[in-house]
Amino acid sequence: MASSVLEMIKEEVTCPICLELLKEPVSADCNHSFCRACITLNYESNRNTDGKGNCPVCRVPYPFGNLRPNLHVANIVERLKGFKSIPEEEQKVNICAQHGEKLRLFCRKDMMVICWLCERSQEHRGHQTALIEEVDQEYKEKLQGALWKLMKKAKICDEWQDDLQLQRVDWENQIQINVENVQRQFKGLRDLLDSKENEELQKLKKEKKEVMEKLEESENELEDQTELVRDLISDVEHHLELSTLEMLQGANCVLRRSQSLSLQQPQTVPQKRKRTFQAPDLKGMLQVYQGLMDIQQYWVHMTLHARNNAVIAINKEKRQIQYRSYNTVPVSEIYHLGVLGYPALSSGKHYWEVDISRSDAWLLGLNDGKCAQPQLHSKEEMGIKKNLHSQIKQNVLFQPKCGYWVIGMKNPSVYKAFDECSITHNSSILVISLPDRPSRVGVFLDRKAGTLSFYDVSNCGALIYRFYDPAFPVEVYPYFNPMKCSEPMTICGPPS
């Protein structure tokens, strides 16, 4: 019993690294104890990138500087060294089970401890043997080497575990982003359908009001006619009840009234006014909207570059621009009202949106960064001034050959694209027909494809206009011009 207790105590004060009684025992934060030399060597060969080591027993990280001497364990070790008795279990372990002799030899071929009779037996005869004291240090070093290799492998496993944890976090984040993206896109689709449903319901509500007002008017007219007929019937019946003399005296008047009475059939709603609801091309709408959502992934964050211009105001976030002067600006100076967005766009795909819901005059698109004033050839500039002579050729101020790729609105019903003929390169103003006034315009630049597209975000992302110019300059800049409208234009941020 005493020997069992002694073995338990020795096990508690044995170094997990060298498997010997602890020498200069130190303890880590996890309370496991090691020889100072062993844990120092272990830390030097296995410390993490953050300067911490991992406990060889429980793998819990620890700062090397936190190792503390364990005097209590050191005292126990010193007392055990003075204890000379050999436990019964150790005595049994040191005795050959076959011959009853002490195990003093080590067979190198069979890698086992034997007694002197085993050495002479047929099983081990001729094998190289040595005293166990002679191979003690050799095999300790081998085991120590094996331990270091295993600990390195354990470190590799820990690194792999860290990599897996990072991958887990990355995947969770990516999937969460995808979940939010799916939810946002389907919310957009639901909002789109709700908007279209509301439009149709408003049309029906308006139609119902018009029809009911018309029918009510017809009912009132019919009621007036009915009252006239009944009054006349009452007069005729009254005359029939009179004496012959009295009847004949009033008959002529009553008959004239009766003969002159003509009925007009009340107006009804013609059958052609009736309409059967036809759902819009939802498939086409969704395809267009999906296309818009696909390019919205290229949303670029930009700011407006403040220019030294007294008539232009830019807010401190540099995302809103408006005309603030009440002085008359000459037509030839309108280009000065333009402001560039940054950064420059030199490659790849880029998308941004502009809120123009309150503006009734604006220009949007790209500029080559020079904002140079083009040579004017006529008095016709964006339709603001009329030609002085019908033979004067129309040219535009904002055209691709002058470094502008823009569309604009002069008033809520006139939309124009300032392009040029791909063959003659003559400037031209193209009038754009839109079903509704856009409140938000999306702009998409694809440098590789050489296209600049404008979308009506407020109308399911319908395409407004597209420039095809594979020869864009090396650097182009988003261009914003509030014209002479005092209402602001605002660069929108991406949806949250």
Swiss-Prot record:
Residues that coordinate or bind Zn(2+): 96, 99, 118, 124
Protein name: Tripartite motif-containing protein 30A
Keywords per UniProt: Coiled coil, Cytoplasm, DNA-binding, Metal-binding, Nucleus, Transcription, Transcription regulation, Zinc, Zinc-finger
Subcellular localization, as worded in the UniProt entry: Cytoplasm; Nucleus
Motif (Nuclear localization signal): 268-276
Zinc finger residue ranges, B box-type: 91-132
Swiss-Prot/TrEMBL GO biological process terms: negative regulation of interleukin-6 production; negative regulation of NLRP3 inflammasome complex assembly; negative regulation of reactive oxygen species metabolic process; negative regulation of toll-like receptor signaling pathway; negative regulation of tumor necrosis factor production; positive regulation of protein catabolic process; positive regulation of viral entry into host cell; protein autoubiquitination
Induction of its expression: By the TLR ligands lipopolysaccharide, CpG dinucleotide and polyinosinic-polycytidylic acid.
Tissue: Highly expressed in spleen and lymph nodes (at protein level).
GO terms for cellular component: cytoplasm; nucleus
Zinc finger (RING-type) residue numbers: 15-59
MF terms in GO: DNA binding; zinc ion binding
UniProt xrefs under InterPro entries: B30.2/SPRY (IPR001870), B30.2/SPRY_sf (IPR043136), Butyrophylin_SPRY (IPR003879), ConA-like_dom_sf (IPR013320), SPRY_dom (IPR003877), TRIM/RBCC (IPR050143), Znf-RING_euk (IPR027370), Znf_B-box (IPR000315)
Domain of life the protein comes from: Eukaryota
Task of the protein: Trans-acting factor that regulates gene expression of interleukin 2 receptor alpha chain. May affect IL2R-alpha expression through cis-acting negative regulatory elements or through competition with proteins that bind to enhancer or activator sequences. Negatively regulates Toll-like receptor (TLR)-mediated activation of NFKB by promoting degradation of TAB2 and TAB3 and preventing TRAF6 autoubiquitination. Negatively regulates production of reactive oxygen species (ROS) which inhibits activation of the NLRP3 inflammasome complex.
Domain B30.2/SPRY: 281-496
UniProt-annotated stretches for the region Highly hydrophilic: 205-210
Coiled coil: 173-239
Origin organism lineage: Eukaryota, Metazoa, Chordata, Craniata, Vertebrata
Gene3D superfamilies, per database record: 2.60.120.920, Classic Zinc Finger, Zinc/RING finger domain, C3HC4 (zinc finger)
Subunit organization: Homomultimer. Interacts with NR2C2/TAK1, TAB2 and TAB3. Does not interact with NLRP3, NLRC4 or TAB1.
